Amino acid sequence: MELMKQLEVWFLVGSQHLYGAATLKQVADHAHTITSQLNERAGLPVKIVLKPTGTTLDEISAIARDANHDQRCIGLMVWMHTFSPAKMWIPALSQLQKPLLQFHTQFNRDLPWSEIDMDFMNLNQTAHGGREFGFMGARLRLPRTVVVGHWQDEEAHRKLGNWMRVAAAIHDSRHLKIARFGDNMRNVAVTEGDKIEAQIQFGYQVNYHPVGDLVKVIDAVPASDIEALLAEYEESYTLTEAVQAGGVLRASLYEAARQELGMKKFLTDGGFGAFTTTFEDLHGLHQLPGLACQRLMQQGFGFGAEGDWKTAALLRTLKVMGTGLAGGTSFMEDYTYHLEAGNNLVLGAHMLEVCPSIAADKPVLDAQHLGIGKKADPARLLFAAPAGKAVNASLIDLGNRFRLVVNQLEVVDLPEAMPKLPVASALWQPMPDLQTSAEAWILAGAAHHSVFTQSVDIEQLRTFADLMGIEFVVIDKHTRIPELKQTLQWNEVYYKLCH
């Protein structure tokens, strides 16, 4: 995903003319040094662009206006090097439409004990200048992120990078187009939702596209392109005998390749970043898209089965956040339980559509019977997720607000092989335990579909919820049901009073 390379975070340093030209030059020099060092050595995912020092209301306001209109700018990072009276910032902060981060740092790490004088004190005032700025953020009720620490510290770099990833995901969501091939699975509740409110809140453009329109594109894929993709499959995966050249189900693999190429063309040509399918609307398709959905997810597209556009959008968001990080992200469903005493586990899977970015080993490519959908045997990749930390995330519509529910997981290795299971899977212990996790998930109303990720963490998801202005509920090792119930009740009152 090349998105990050095209984006910028603007760095605006606050000061004022009270201190004179010499001090302002030092402020500008320090800001330039910090910018260049962060860009070169901090491993940040997005380039920082330094703007002129903000010393007046008009200067600061102009930069905020420019940030709003510049499509490369995903957010504004501010630092109060000296004291910068916050009334100068009111128009800028009131009109800013991009994520805001206050970097509460200072140029020097240590106090120059034997040399410190009032010139030094007047130059390095972030300790109280940052508090002045913080008051205005609170007064304006601004969603914002604060990172505290020296600009050379790795922990500060990590937090800056996390915020940049969230800002990039928000930037992407503001322009996200989601193609719904078919409608929601009939009579299912949680996959429904208010698409207008979703566009107001997140920017999601969710629209229906007839499967017949997609079929026309799939049917027009050249045979030479299909053969080239089959060669890629053979190089990337371990093919079962049935789908190898001359195998009894080679035609199913051929059709899956045609589907992938056609679906990718439809999505790319239409500027879509996410899509949904449904097994109840496959008119003109020879098989339920399985392999195509798996591989399109791996290429960065969001996906939701059975018309689940909210999960498709959230998956795309996490794909953007996790760009370049270790671990993968996939559509997922809590499918079935292992209820052995002292070793409760959840087996996550879906009919076909689990992203190979979470595969522990080289996937196996096969085609097998699938009764749901009543079509030909679909191709699919088979694999298991690696052991390690993970998160499940679910975005739901509660009528008066969206709620993002996340559950901390510990993925474990399969204790035994599952040779008859024809789908990819992940096996995990939910935190703090299955009983508490499942009860909390159900009380919070989270969906049976989720986004499973081993690259994005709870901190990033919390920041996303904060900046998007949506409710956030976390289930982790500290969760206790009585406290969770209280939190849900308090949240209900808060959102009715304040939104």
From Swiss-Prot:
A GO term, aspect molecular function: L-arabinose isomerase activity
Which UniProt keywords are present, listed alphabetically? Arabinose catabolism, Carbohydrate metabolism, Isomerase, Manganese, Metal-binding
The terms describing its cellular component in GO are: cytosol
Instruction: Give the EC number.
Output: 5.3.1.4
InterPro entries, alphabetized: Ara_Isoase_C, AraA_central, AraA_N, AraA_N_sf, Fuc/Ara_isomerase_C, Fucose_isomerase_N/cen_sf, Lara_isomerase
The family database entries (Gene3D superfamilies) matched by this protein are listed as:
3.40.50.10940
Cofactor-binding details, from the entry: Binds 1 Mn(2+) ion per subunit.
NCBIfam families found in the cross-reference section: PRK02929.1
State the protein's name. Answer: L-arabinose isomerase
